[in-house]
Amino acid sequence: MSTYFLKLYVTNMTPKIEGSVEKLRQVCDQELNGEYDFKIINILENPQLAEGDRVLATPTLIKELPTPVKRIIGDISNTEKVLFGLDLLKKD
């Protein structure tokens, strides 16, 4: 079982989002030692999931586990800021 669970809500996978996701996965592999699950959800295909998580804008990245739940809305291209905002940076 993974220690971290992340969900990314998107409207569609643009090249910018794809690049940000790849970079985020690489950093999570390094920072979280690969102990995470990462799910990408297209709100056009699964609007009920977005409604359940109260997603009002895309992209929205949600860290569900470990608690507390945290979210980043908007640009996810700066992975360091994203990891800091989600409280995922390793403590040195």
What are these regions (language model features)?
Residues 51-57:
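Thiol/disulfide oxidoreductase modules built on the thioredoxin-like
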Residues 25-37:
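Conserved helix-turn-beta segment immediately C-terminal to the redox Cys motif
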Residues 76-92:
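Ser/Thr/Gly-rich flexible loops in soluble cytosolic domains mediating phosphotransfer, phosphorylation
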